[in-house]
Amino acid sequence: MTVLRLLAAMLALILGMAATPAAAWGEFGHRTTASIALANVRPETRAAIQRLFPYAERLGTPECPLQSLEDAAVWPDCVRAQGSRWAYTAPWHYRTAPICEAFNPRANCASGNCVTAQIERAQRVLSDESLPGNVRLEALAFMVHFAGDVHMPLHSGDREDRGGNDREVTYGIVPDLNLHWAWDGPLAERAISSAQPALTRPYSAEERQALAGGGPDAWGRESWETARDFVYPEAFDRPPCEGELPKEATLTQEDIVRALPVAERRITQAGLRIAELLDAAFAPGKLAEPERR
């Protein structure tokens, strides 16, 4: 295959990816957060996770495998695409807030139908050993996936554009993406594949202290601030709240390079925090009650 044909094939692949529905971090990003988590949980947590996978058949989703934590990290996006059975879960993947208004941690979460509330709900279901294994396995998948979602800046920050879905961008030489998917897919994948050292590894206590901790509301605020202070200004080369933003933008190679450490940090934080959620869910005793919304 000539270099020109190879580049054309790669371009076709990326454009094909761009046509898929937005899902935070894309499959590769979500699987990476799960791999990071699995490398950093306690051994007894890892064993408890493995004991749930035999219940996957009872969920009745053969088209969406659920035999590993990496599968669990993408399972909610897979089932959401299967039709009406899982349509009610669509609002659980995000909680966007306008970046040009004061952040309100209680907004856009009616009846718990938002990503931050569903992380807490799923963790409590997962921790309840009196529940059937298939119910806990479903909760495991939702918790792991949504904890990844909340770390994606454009699942929390919004400029009247559905978290960047309505802003067309050219990503390097690749046209016709949207801002949301540029961050979900190619940017996240490049951040993961170029990271040195590799993101999937055991982290030291000092690294975990610097990168992990907090709870879903705080993680959502971090993502909102990242969207406000970096994603939108970097994409449009201007303060995002001074007048209307254009509907189109170009992410140059320089823009992409500046964004890589931001994406890398959010993916790493997601993985380490998923590990903390898992360790807490499988630890003896009851979880603390979440703050009431």
Q: What label would you give each PLM region?
A:
Residues A23-F146, P153-R293:
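N-terminal, motif-rich segments that launch catalysis or mediate targeting to/interaction with membranes
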Residues M1-M10:
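Bacterial N-terminal signal peptides that target proteins for export
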Residues A19-P21:
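N-terminal signal peptide c-region/cleavage motif recognized by signal peptidases
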